Amino acid sequence: MGGAGDLNLIYAAVRLCGARRAVETGVAHGWSSLAILAALAENGGGGLASVDMPYPKMHNEPFVGIVVPSGLRENWTLIRLPDRNGLKQAITRFEGSIDFAHYDSDKSYYGRKFAYPLIWQALAPGGVFISDDIQDNMRFAEFVAEKDISFAVTECAGRCVGICRNS
């Protein structure tokens, strides 16, 4: 199970864009879920649909999302499917339009090639998209170049994070 990521960045992005509908991939212990849900609560409410691939042989089911307190869980939907099915389901939960997305799951080039366009197509104007670990391959750089998207890159714990806003 993965680490926490840049929780301050995630929280601030959700707050600053005024998100009400959020999607994330890659839950693990739920640190990013907690940051998103806390920011949504400060924004006056909203919902988070999180996609996390089950790993039955790891016996980690009881620990997925464990840090999310019960008071924030009512606005949280946890979808235990691989990205290819789960991401579509998460976006559909918000009728195809989201304000914030955090991608932290399939790090492969082809995983990102599948997910990024789905996320971007659903991202409402003013919405923010964050992708963790973009140094793993060139897909984030290619995606923002193909779509002519303004972006920023930051670093957290030695890993690169890509950020862009739908204008």
How would you describe each model-predicted region?
Residues 4-167:
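S-adenosylmethionine/decaboxylated-SAM
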